[in-house]
Amino acid sequence: MIPGELFIQDGEIELNAGRKTVTLSVANTGDRPIQVGSHYHFFETNPALKFDRKKARGMRLDIAAGTAVRFEPGQTRDVQLVALAGKRMVYGFRGDVMGKL
């Protein structure tokens, strides 16, 4: 074995298997690009992003860890969100929750 070497089984790896998901249409109404990282609480994203925030509470982008989605000014795109796991407590970000979901 080589340090850092990975042994991966054949087949597909499904991210976030079995978790609740929702697809939302998101519009950037601002004049600057907005980038949202994989583990950012989507409910608390930049107010220039217009979407159903109620449905996004407790959710994050359903993308690989360490990646992001960029919304250009005037752009509307559909994104899939996935439920946050663990203790489902949210602190920081924009300070809109600061506790249990």
Curated annotation (Swiss-Prot):
Q: Which family does it belong to?
A: Belongs to the urease beta subunit family.
- Kindly list any coiled-coil regions of this protein: none
Which compartment or compartments is the protein found in? Cytoplasm
Disulfide bridge positions per record:
none
Q: Which PANTHER family match?
A: UREASE
Pfam families associated with the record: Urease_beta
Which pathway does the database say it acts in? Nitrogen metabolism; urea degradation; CO(2) and NH(3) from urea (urease route): step 1/1
Q: What is this protein called?
A: Urease subunit beta
Q: Which molecular-function annotations from GO does this UniProt entry contain?
A: urease activity
- Assembly and interaction partners: Heterotrimer of UreA (gamma), UreB (beta) and UreC (alpha) subunits. Three heterotrimers associate to form the active enzyme.
* Keywords carried by this UniProt record: Cytoplasm, Hydrolase
Give Gene Ontology CC terms.
urease complex
UniProt record, GO biological process: urea catabolic process
Which regions span the lipid bilayer?
none
What reaction is this protein's catalytic activity? Answer: urea + 2 H2O + H(+) = hydrogencarbonate + 2 NH4(+)
UniProt xrefs under Gene3D superfamilies: Urease, beta subunit (2.10.150.10)
This enzyme's EC code(s): 3.5.1.5
Tell me what organism the protein belongs to: Bradyrhizobium sp. (strain BTAi1 / ATCC BAA-1182)
Q: Which CDD domains match?
A: Urease_beta (cd00407)
